[in-house]
Amino acid sequence: MSESVRTNTSIWSKGMLSVIVAQFLSAFGDNALLFATLALLKAQFYPDWSQPVLQMVFVGAYILFAPFVGQIADSFAKGRVMMVANGLKLAGAAGICLGINPFVGYTLVGIGAAAYSPAKYGILGELTTGDKLVKANGLMEASTIAAILLGSVAGGVLADWHVIAALVACALAYAGAVAANLFIPKLVAARPGQSWRLSAMTRSFFSACVVLWRNGETRFSLVGTGLFWGAGVTLRFLLVLWVPVALGITDNATPTYLNAMVAVGIVVGAGAAAKLVTLETVSRCMPAGILIGVVVAIFSLQHALLPAYALLLLIGMLGGFFVVPLNALLQERGKKSVGAGNAIAVQNLGENSAMLLMLGLYSLAVLVGVPAVAIGIGFGVLFALAIAALWIWQRRQASY
C-alpha cells in the first residue's frame, strides 16, 4: 500500500470517492431489482404472500454466509472483495433477465450482497478514522439512500413500462459498480493468514459474536441496528400492500415513490447525525428511534397521498438520525476488538435475523388475512416499545 493511501484520511480522498460511487451504483441496482422483480412476480401471478418470501431468500443468504464473509473481507483487499461481490450480483440480475426462476436469481444477488457488506463498511475504517468515521458513514448512508431513492423509483417506473427493461437496467448498474471498484486503492488486507477450514472459520465468527455481545456499547449497537433494518425492510413490503388498500392505487410506481420519500428523509437525518452526534454521545439518537414507531402507526391511518408523503419523509429523517451513529459506534469499537470485517459480518447476522423474523411474521399476518392498516399500526407500536426498552436497558447497563 502506498504512503499516500496510508496517510490520506480525508473523507474526500480518491479512495473514499471511489467507494461511494461503487456503493451508489450497487445500491441502485439492489433497489431497482427488488421492485422490478416484484413486478415480475405480479405479472406471473404469484400470490401476495410470496412477495416478502422473495426478500427472505435474499436475507437467508446473509445469514447462511455470515460466518465466512467477515473473514473474507479482512483477508483480502476490501476493494477487490467488493468487485467480486458486485460480479455475483450482476450474474443474478442477468439470470433473471434470461428467464431463470426469480427466486434463484435473487438468491445469487443475496450471496453477492452478503459478501459485499462487510467490505464496504469495513473499508471506511481503513480510509479514515475517529470522528471522521461518523462523517464517512453519513456520506455512505447518504449515497446509499440516494441510490434507494433513484433505484426504487427507476425500478417501479421502468417495470410499469417494460419489466425486462427494468431488469436490464439493474444488470447495467451492477456492471457499473464492478467498474467503479477498479478505482478503489488496493489496501493491505486487515487480517491475512487466517485459517480457511470451515470449522475454524465458524468458531472464529461465533467467537467474534461473543466478544461483541459482551461489550455493552457494541451490544447496544447490534440490537439497535437490527431492529431498525428489520423494521425498514418490512415497511417496504407493507407499502406495496398498503397503497392499493388505503389509497386505491394499483400501479408499481406509487409504492416506489413513497419509499423514495423515506430515502430522502434518511439523507437529511444522516447529515444531521454527522453534525450533532459523536461516538461519545450516541444515546442522543434514541428518541428518534422511538418516534419512528409512533409515526409509522400514524401513517398507517392515512388515506391521502400528501400526508403519506410528509409522514414517510419524517420517518426517514428520524431513521437516518437513529442508525448512522449506531453504525459508526460498532465499526470503531469492533475494529479494535474483532476487526471491522468481522464486526460488520456479526452486525449483518443480527440485522438479517431480525429481517427474517419480521418478514416471516408479516408474511404470516398477510396469509391469515390481517388488514394492511392493522398490520401497520401494530408494527409501529411494537417498534416504538422495542426501542424504548432498548434505551432503558442501555441506560441501566451504563449505570453499573
Swiss-Prot record:
SUPFAM superfamilies: MFS general substrate transporter (SSF103473). Signal peptide: none annotated. One of its GO terms (molecular function) is lysophospholipid:sodium symporter activity. The chain crosses the membrane at residues 19-39, 53-73, 91-111, 139-159, 164-184, 195-213, 227-247, 257-277, 281-301, 304-324, 352-372, 373-393. It is a multi-pass membrane protein. It is found in: Cell inner membrane. Gene3D superfamilies: MFS general substrate transporter like domains. GO terms for cellular component: plasma membrane. Its main location: membrane. Keywords: Cell inner membrane, Cell membrane, Lipid transport, Membrane, Transmembrane, Transmembrane helix, Transport. Catalyzes the facilitated diffusion of 2-acyl-glycero-3-phosphoethanolamine (2-acyl-GPE) into the cell. Belongs to the major facilitator superfamily. LplT (TC 2.A.1.42) family. NCBIfam families: PRK11195.1. This is Lysophospholipid transporter LplT. It comes from Salmonella typhimurium (strain LT2 / SGSC1412 / ATCC 700720).
